[in-house]
Amino acid sequence: YVEGGVIYRNTQDYIKRDLSTVGGTSYGSYTNHGRVETKGFNVSLRYSYSNWFNLGGTFNNLDTRDKEKKRAASSGQNALTYGQRIPNIPYQYANVDMNFYWHNLFAKGNTLTFGWDCFYQHDFPLYWESFGDPSTKIRVPQQISHNLSLGYSIRNGRYNISFECRNLTDEKLYDNFSLQKAGRAFYGKFRVYFGK
């Protein structure tokens, strides 16, 4: 299947979380923007072949901008950020996943699943783009991460064993506040379903 969507949002009293530094200490604060406009689109694709393979992905593009012309209604001062993209918000990102299934492997009702997924995020500014020298701007960098998973389901899902490798290539990944996430990690899980 293929599906898509268009996004338009006119937000009044948009509250944005900021990251501020005073004397070497960072802290979060909140700023109210009178009006913020978001325009964008998303596309999803998914292909399945029989009951043993599927491939899919999504792409998202969002443009979130400050639309408050005055700093405060009573001040009459023009807002320096009018028309600028709201900082610290990813605006372009995508993911792709692929899964293989081997049904009735070793016994009827057992399934082996192998999966791969990839996440992409375009770089984005941590602070307002028009403030300061463009050559010294702090940006949350572009990110690409790959994950692998292997699972074995026994007796139609009553028992499940799974292993996962997150961030397979050990890339440097960051959250919205440019704080580095954990590197390559391995996980294992055993689950028993006690229902009927």
Roles of regions detected by a PLM:
Residues 1-3, 48, 143-147:
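Short, mixed-charge, low-aromatic patches
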Residues 1-33, 37-39:
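Membrane-embedded beta-barrel scaffold of Gram-negative outer-membrane proteins
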Residues 6, 10, 25-31, 81-84, ...:
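Residue-level signal for pocket-adjacent positions within structured domains
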Residues 8-11, 31-125:
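Gram-negative outer-membrane beta-barrel transporters
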Residues 14-22, 62, 66-75, 125-133, ...:
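Outer-membrane beta-barrel translocator domains and adjoining extracellular loop/strand segments
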Residues 23, 41-47, 189-193:
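Noncatalytic linker/hinge segments flanking ATPase motor cores
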Residues 25-27, 62, 68, 77-80, ...:
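Short, intrinsically disordered/low-complexity patches at protein termini
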Residues 84-196:
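Conserved C-terminal beta-signal and adjacent last beta-strands/turns
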